Amino acid sequence: MEHKLFWCKVNKFYLNKRIAHLQTTKQDADDIFLVATCVVTDRAKSKWVKEILDHLHQDKRVYIAGCGSMNRGEAMDRSVFFGLYPELFPYEEKIVLLAEDPDQDPRNFSSGLKTPGQKLRTKNYIIIQNWCDNYCSFCLTIFKRGGHRNRPLEEIIAEINQVEAEGGKEVVITGINLAAWWASDTRKSEESRFSYLLEEILKQTTIPRIRISSIDPQYLTDHFFQVVSNPRFVPHFHFSIQSFSDPILKAMNRGYLSDKLDEVLTKIRRLDRPDQDQISIWADIISSFPWETEQDFQITCDAVQKYGITKLHAFPFSDHHKAEKIPASLLPDQIPQEIRKERNRRLIEIGEEVRDRFVESHYGKTMQVLIEEVKNGKSKGRTQNYIQVQIPWEYEKWSIVDVVLDEKNCIY
C-alpha cells in the first residue's frame, strides 16, 4: 500500500494510526493509495487533488484522510465532498473518505491513542491535544477536526517512556493547538498547563531529545521559558505568528498583539542555556490578509529580520474559493492576487537571507545529527536545531552522529 502525507505533524500521527489499522485489518492491498490531506490553503488542496488524480489514473483505489476528508472529525458527506472537488467525482467508486481516527471514541481522547507501527522509528510524534476553539478568521481547519480534547498526563508520560524503551531518541510533542493543553477551552489561555506538562516530561522521562511542534504565543508564561532552558529541549522553536501588525492580528482574531510576540521572541533568544547561539526560530506567516497595507506588511518583514526568524512557512492569504468559505474571505478590501504573490515572494526572500546567515554561522561547529534517510551511499538528517545535513557515507538509520557542518553538507 502506497501512502503520502501532506502538511502537519498531527496528520502524520493519524496517518501512522491509519496505516497500522489497515495492516491489522488486512486492507493494505497494493492497489490502495492512502493520502493524508491538508486544507490550509487552496494551493495545498490542489496539490493533493492532483496526487489523487495521478493515482486514480493508475487504476488505484484511494483512501482519503486528513482535513480534506472530514467535517468535525467525522468522514464528510460524500455529496458535499464531490461538490467541493468535482474533478474527483468521475472516480467516485474508487474513493473512500475516512474519519479522523480509525478506532477512537470521539468522546474519549485517550481511547486507542497510542501510535502503533513506530517501534523502528527514532523520532516519534506524541499527540497531547486536539482541536481548537479560537476561530481565527482565516482558518478552515477548525471546522475539520473533532472537538477540543486534552490527553491525560499519565498517558503522555507512559508513551514517551515506551518510545525510549523501544530505542527512540527523540519525541515531537504535537497537537492542533498544543500550548493550550489542559484548558477547558483554547480561548482561555490562563487555564493552559502546557509548561507544567513539559516540566513533568523532564522529571518523569529520560529521552534525550524533546522537540516541540508549532505553538501559539498567548499561552507562554515565564515558567515555560524556565522549563525549555533545559538542553533536553532541542534549540528549535516553531511559532504560529501570522503577522506582526496589530490591526491585522486583530482582524485575524489571533488573541494576542505584537507586544506578546516581542516578549516571547526576545525571551527565546535570551534563554539561559549553553547552546543559546544555536537557537532556531521558525514561524508561520500569512501575507496579504484583507486590509493589509504596505506598512503592515513592512512591519512583518522588519520583524523577521529583527528577531532572526530562521525559517518561514510563508503563505499568501487564501480565501478558499472552493466553496468552503472562511470569515476573512467575506471581508472587504481583499488584496489583488498579483500583490499577494509579490508580497509573499519578498517575504520568502527575506526569510532565506536570514536563514542563510544562520546556517553559515554554524560552519565549523560539531553538531549532533539524527539520521533519517540512508540511500545511495549518503545519509540525510537534521541537527538539534533542524538544519538539514547530507553526509557522503552511510550511517545506521535513526542513529545520532557528530558532524562538523560546512557549506557542502548543509542542504537546509
State what each model feature region is.
Residues 1-12, 109-138, 142, 157, ...:
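N-terminal pre-triad scaffold of radical SAM enzymes
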Residues 1-98:
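Cofactor-cradling patches in redox/metallo enzymes
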Residues 10-20, 139-155, 184, 331:
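Iron-sulfur (Fe-S) cluster-binding segments and ferredoxin-like electron-carrier domains
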Residues 42-51, 147-149, 248-253:
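Glycine/threonine-rich flexible loop motifs
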Residues 62-65, 70-73, 165-295, 305:
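Conserved SAM/AdoMet-binding glycine-rich loop
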Residues 181-202, 251-258, 319-353:
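Radical SAM enzyme [4Fe-4S]-AdoMet core and its adjacent flexible, acidic
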Residues 327-412:
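Terminal RNA-binding accessory module
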